[in-house]
Amino acid sequence: MITKTYKDISEEKFYKLYFDLVNVLKPTDQITYTESLVLIEFLLLKEEKYKHARFAARAKREVIKILQEKYDKKVSMTYMAVILANLESKGWIEKEPDGIKYFNKKHQAVVDRILTSNDYEEIIFKLKVKQNNEH
């Protein structure tokens, strides 16, 4: 068995690890490096004003500013719209009937469980190799 324990990592580092793990499980629609940077910054916005407007114009402007300051990445509103459309088409962002966009609910449930736990949480991969008698 292979195990790896992460102790007291930042929320940002957690998201990076989580996206990397999910990419291992998904043969298609994997999140790219730039998409993950952008999505992480949206998810790190904690103010109440972003709770139900996580991907709205105000949040987009804030994330663009953060990307410039933190990574020296210049992202236009047009390019931001393309990145968010890609994340939506890949299932990372979901649009509710009321038109509001949210982080995928299944991923959010896993993330919330891990982020609010006082103990270690496990993410388990189970593998079974097909037995083939032919070479």
Residue ranges of predicted features:
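A short, conserved structural fragment
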Residues: 85-101
